[in-house]
Amino acid sequence: MAFPAGFGWAAATAAYQVEGGWDADGKGPCVWDTFTHQGGERVFKNQTGDVACGSYTLWEEDLKCIKQLGLTHYRFSLSWSRLLPDGTTGFINQKGIDYYNKIIDDLLKNGVTPIVTLYHFDLPQTLEDQGGWLSEAIIESFDKYAQFCFSTFGDRVKQWITINEANVLSVMSYDLGMFPPGIPHFGTGGYQAAHNLIKAHARSWHSYDSLFRKKQKGMVSLSLFAVWLEPADPNSVSDQEAAKRAITFHLDLFAKPIFIDGDYPEVVKSQIASMSQKQGYPSSRLPEFTEEEKKMIKGTADFFAVQYYTTRLIKYQENKKGELGILQDAEIEFFPDPSWKNVDWIYVVPWGVCKLLKYIKDTYNNPVIYITENGFPQSDPAPLDDTQRWEYFRQTFQELFKAIQLDKVNLQVYCAWSLLDNFEWNQGYSSRFGLFHVDFEDPARPRVPYTSAKEYAKIIRNNGLEAHL
């Protein structure tokens, strides 16, 4: 089961989740610094990313892990407030530039291609104080930051992700309030943030296109989180429609404007407009793009970056009471099949990724696809011999092989989440996704490979699985 020649085998991390050094060498505070320092049990045991894996000082150790796996690509993110402590180019932190230059140069020296994320949930606190993603002012701030990164690192970085999981960020931070700033705005904040995230991404893509592409010859996209969604009752028309609506609300709401035509899907617009009207709003809670903005947004991605972890069943749930919220707007309820195995929120459904990839191929004109995250957690304490978890990975690779061979999906890169056990947002250090175990009790933060790391290294060496379908 050999994958296509030149297939990219990667692992991923993100700045706040691994770096630590939260106030080292002139770094400014980000929203997760503020949020975790406030306590209040919003994060498991009030844990913080102040030290995390210590990657800010232990990059050499991370590099050893990368070399041990034989990765072809490594995806990491830049800390916006490490580079620009107040979020603006008014003051530039040279120590931050030096740190990322070293990572990029070391990767290239070792034949590893960097995939760099500009922004992975860790907004500079100064910009959150000015309204964050609910304010239109952020679009310009993000564009300036993106241009700064393109001009500083783009001579060597050719694969960029502007915004990580924009669809998760908008909902978790600004609708449900489970991520910083921690203030819920049910049924309004998520859409407002989505609107600004889409425009910020598009602006930065155009900046790359007009100012840097000719010389640097790179590619720019954003990454979107996607759960595959199946009708709970495959014979029920209302469940079938609900499953389609669910995918549209959570993936296409971002992907359709960017990849197809600059505007939100019709069903999203009509559902939210009709709910808003019933609730007595003077206009839809979903903001509208101007014709000018639609032109600006359309076609602003050079590849499709998707992050798949799990699948859910969907059934139709009429919003009789007119409650506010995104699920209520979509009129859906989601839940797992009781027969699926799970660790925490991740139910193991490897076939879901095959269906998702086919959906992206068919809906978005057969784009080049990167899976920029996929993985399985272990609960703490996690055994180093994680054979059960490796089995989930193996089944996933079989499904990817099928998608490439049978469905002719143009999948070019796979990133395992994550290189290291790390700070998993609200779950703190209780959920371990690493290919390498990190001992968070030991100040030296030693990295030790799980069985999965050794097995993944074999897959990379063979460019695929040894067994046949």
Swiss-Prot record:
One of its GO terms (biological process) is positive regulation of exo-alpha-sialidase activity. Keywords: Cytoplasm, Glycosidase, Hydrolase, Lipid metabolism. The keyword Hydrolase applies. GO terms for cellular component: catalytic complex; cytosol; membrane. PROSITE patterns: GLYCOSYL_HYDROL_F1_2 (PS00653). Present in small intestine (at protein level). Expressed in liver, small intestine, colon, spleen and kidney. Down-regulated in renal cell carcinomas and hepatocellular carcinomas. Its main location: cytoplasm. It holds the Pfam family Glyco_hydro_1. Optimum pH is 6.0-7.0 for the glucosylceramidase activity. Optimum pH is 6.0 for the hydrolysis of 4-methylumbelliferyl-beta-D-glucopyranoside. Activity decreases sharply with increasing acidity and is less than 4% at pH 4. Optimum temperature is 50 degrees Celsius. Stable more than 24 hours at 37 degrees Celsius. Loses activity at 58 degrees Celsius. The N-terminus is blocked. This is Cytosolic beta-glucosidase.
